[in-house]
């Protein structure tokens, strides 16, 4: 596929780690720096009328730079695709962390909530409203710090932040009353309500307003009455009351939230919402490395970087900066490499870009070790990258003054967003304090990635020449990433979901349709490619036994010691729950459908051997669909198994 040619010059694609209505997210490795990234891939034709929202998200992320907001690195647009290269957050969703704990303690909630406040206050200070705040849109990085994602529904009102918005959007369970009534509203006030729902979920483990019936849920939200669990402290109850006010004019403001007594408890200062990482000053080490690599002067390189075009040069600079911040040398790779353990396979020419279109998961290459990209190199040297230097020399005479951001050409904005010049934001005086750490295990965890048991070369025609004489190295199946130590999910209360997308023109009932195995054509296409590439036994297949993993917050422990028995138990219960599935070794790729045949949920269940004797577990990962429906469904499946 020609749409992928340019992308594959700079990145090696691996497995799909998330899907949505019109997009999928793949794990990838940036070739020059060896850093892991997440690439959001969107089809323009499928987006249709939602294309302006993608432009809005890109514009927002280009102008937002904050320690608790997922960083945009690179935007690539072709005739049919839009690629957004984003910061990879291996820690997983806040939602998964909450349900693994049942609920968080008030102290831990405060640490998490202050980070959410910091991100949202900064977003508001830049004139934006997020409008889709929920646990699924908050990810943990490798340091267990939160990052806000998904700005597809954000709005930058015409005029100023006091301009009233009209669009009803977001998720019903988190939406403010004035928004679902169809009234005009202030984005900042609606976000405060959503943060109130978030705060409740953090401390309680379930939604304050929840019902299977949409109209019943609507009435509950409008009444503003919710259960107050006995374990909530008086100060937390008061804060929830102030945030979950049905009348937005009586709702607490963001300014007062930042120094609220509950938020300030155990802290000596209000929440520090200003950006700690502004792009007003370029890092000398990173600029020098890029200058040497592209054989250009420092001044030329500084001018090119400072134009912030969010092309490959911007991505390389920001990834070098991230690498340096993690204590790694700000150096670019000079050798041909692939991110993973060594594996000799047939030449990569056997896998063409045309093969890429046969499956969503055709780039699956196994469980990724976050550090392997920069450590595992092959001997043969690759030709120097000269294309960008040529472009840079041509652009040097035209490049804007340092610090000026280029506006996106042909912007498509909705009625609530306006094209405004972007400028660097000066930091105000920052509060200095040391945040207490969230109680996690000694080893920081990394996000579990759905893995394919077969390793195969990356389908990159653009890089075929420099890899022609070298064996291809792709990610192998690791034993799993360092993880949090938590137990079995046993929620205080079973949560139903009414996390309804308010942008949908129709509502659907709970999935009831029974079907046969799905993903057939996709899987068959992928299997043909894999069979052509390797004749040996697939590692990770049923004959090899389950993969070994460390205990993670999305792994449920069992009392069974026989993995085959557990796998049989799960496969027997899935049809009873109206779940279609495809088996690949000890991994079950599952999905549910509506009565109209629409896929409503996709997730994986993998039987794994935990890294201690005679203990078998189940790894769970949601790929698509409502988080609370997923939670309830997986609980029903696991409770039906004899574990």
Swiss-Prot record:
Main location: membrane
Stretches the record annotates as Autoinhibitory region: 326-643
EC number: 2.7.11.1, 2.7.10.2
Coiled-coil features, chain-numbered ranges: none
Catalytic activity: L-tyrosyl-[protein] + ATP = O-phospho-L-tyrosyl-[protein] + ADP + H(+); L-seryl-[protein] + ATP = O-phospho-L-seryl-[protein] + ADP + H(+); L-threonyl-[protein] + ATP = O-phospho-L-threonyl-[protein] + ADP + H(+)
GO cellular component, one term: plasma membrane
Membrane topology recorded in Swiss-Prot or TrEMBL: Peripheral membrane protein
UniProt-annotated location(s): Cell membrane
Positions of modified residues (Phosphoserine): 171, 253, 336, 343, 352, 399, 423, 490, 497, 521
Post-translational modifications reported in the UniProt record: Autophosphorylated: autophosphorylation of the T-loop at Thr-167 and Ser-171 is required for activation.
Keywords, ordered alphabetically: Apoptosis, ATP-binding, Calcium, Cell cycle, Cell membrane, Kinase, Lipid-binding, Membrane, Nucleotide-binding, Phosphoprotein, Serine/threonine-protein kinase, Transferase
GO MF terms, alphabetically ordered: ATP binding; calcium ion binding; lipid binding; non-membrane spanning protein tyrosine kinase activity; protein kinase activity; protein serine kinase activity; protein serine/threonine kinase activity
List of residues binding ATP: 17-25, 40
Active site feature: 132
Positions where Phosphotyrosine occurs in the chain: 163
Protein role: Serine/threonine-protein kinase involved in various processes such as cell cycle regulation, self-renewal of stem cells, apoptosis and splicing regulation. Has a broad substrate specificity; phosphorylates BCL2L14, CDC25B, MAP3K5/ASK1 and ZNF622. Acts as an activator of apoptosis by phosphorylating and activating MAP3K5/ASK1. Acts as a regulator of cell cycle, notably by mediating phosphorylation of CDC25B, promoting localization of CDC25B to the centrosome and the spindle poles during mitosis. Plays a key role in cell proliferation.
Designated name of the protein: Maternal embryonic leucine zipper kinase
Annotated source species: Mus musculus (Mouse)
Gene this chain is encoded by: Melk
């Amino acid at each position: 596929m020609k749409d992928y040619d340019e992308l594959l010059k700079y990145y090696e694609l691996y497995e799909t780690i998330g899907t949505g209505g019109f997009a999928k997210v793949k794990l990838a490795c940036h070739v020059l720096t060896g850093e892991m990234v997440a690439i959001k891939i969107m089809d323009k034709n499928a987006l249709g009328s939602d294309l302006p929202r993608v432009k809005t998200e890109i514009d927002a992320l280009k102008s937002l730079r904050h320690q608790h907001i997922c960083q945009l690195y690179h935007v690539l647009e072709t005739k049919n695709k839009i690629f957004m290269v984003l910061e990879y957050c291996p820690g997983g969703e806040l939602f998964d962390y909450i349900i693994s704990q049942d609920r968080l303690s008030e102290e831990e909630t405060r640490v998490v909530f202050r980070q959410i406040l910091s991100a949202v206050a900064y977003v508001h200070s830049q004139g934006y409203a997020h409008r889709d705040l929920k646990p699924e849109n908050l990810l943990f990085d490798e340091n267990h710090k939160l990052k806000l994602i998904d700005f597809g529904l954000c709005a930058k009102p015409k005029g100023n932040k006091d301009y009233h918005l009209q669009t009803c959007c977001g998720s019903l369970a988190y939406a403010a009353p004035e928004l679902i009534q169809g009234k005009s509203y202030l984005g900042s006030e609606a976000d405060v309500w959503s943060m109130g729902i978030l705060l409740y979920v953090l401390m309680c483990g379930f939604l304050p307003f929840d019902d299977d019936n949409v109209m019943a849920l609507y009435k509950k939200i409008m009444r503003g009455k919710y259960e107050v669990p006995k374990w909530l402290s008086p100060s937390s109850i008061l804060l929830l009351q102030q945030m979950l006010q049905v009348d937005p004019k009586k709702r607490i403001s963001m300014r007062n939230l930042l120094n609220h007594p509950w938020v300030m408890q155990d802290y000596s200062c209000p929440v520090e919402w200003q950006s700690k990482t502004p792009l007003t000053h370029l890092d000398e080490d990173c600029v020098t490395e890029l200058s040497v690599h592209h054989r250009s002067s420092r001044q030329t390189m500084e001018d090119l970087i400072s134009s912030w075009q969010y092309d490959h040069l911007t991505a390389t600079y920001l990834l070098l900066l991230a690498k340096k911040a993690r204590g790694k040398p700000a150096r670019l790779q000079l050798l041909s490499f692939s991110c993973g353990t060594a594996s000799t396979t047939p030449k990569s020419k056997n896998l063409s870009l045309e093969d890429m279109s046969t499956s969503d998961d055709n780039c699956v290459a196994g469980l990724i070790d976050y550090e392997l990209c920069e450590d595992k190199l092959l001997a043969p040297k690759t030709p120097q990258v000269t294309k960008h230097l040529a472009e840079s020399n041509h652009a040097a005479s035209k490049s804007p003054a340092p610090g000026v951001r280029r506006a996106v050409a042909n912007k498509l904005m909705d009625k609530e967003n306006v094209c405004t010049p972007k400028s660097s934001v000066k930091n105000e005086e920052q509060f200095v304090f040391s945040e207490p750490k969230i109680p996690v295990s000694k080893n920081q965890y990394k996000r579990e990635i759905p893995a394919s048991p077969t390793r195969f070369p990356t389908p990159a025609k653009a890089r075929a020449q420099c890899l022609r004489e070298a064996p291809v190295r792709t990610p192998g199946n690791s034993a799993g990433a360092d993880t949090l130590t938590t137990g079995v999910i046993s929620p205080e209360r079973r949560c139903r979901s009414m996390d309804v997308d308010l942008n949908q023109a129709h509502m659907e009932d709970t999935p009831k349709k029974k079907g046969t195995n799905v993903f057939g054509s996709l899987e068959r296409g992928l299997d043909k490619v894999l069979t052509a590439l390797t004749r040996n036994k697939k590692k990770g297949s049923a004959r090899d036994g389950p993969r070994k993993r460390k205990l993670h917050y999305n792994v449920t422990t069992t009392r069974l010691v026989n993995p085959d028995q557990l796998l049989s138990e799960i496969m027997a219960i899935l049809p009873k729950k109206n779940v279609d599935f495809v088996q690949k070794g000890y991994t079950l790729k599952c999905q549910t459908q509506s009565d109209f045949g629409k896929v409503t949920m996709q997730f994986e269940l993998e039987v794994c051997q935990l890294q201690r004797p005679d203990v078998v577990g189940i790894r769970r990962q949601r790929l698509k669909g409502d988080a609370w429906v997923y939670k309830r469904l997986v609980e029903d499946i696991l409770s039906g198994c004899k574990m």
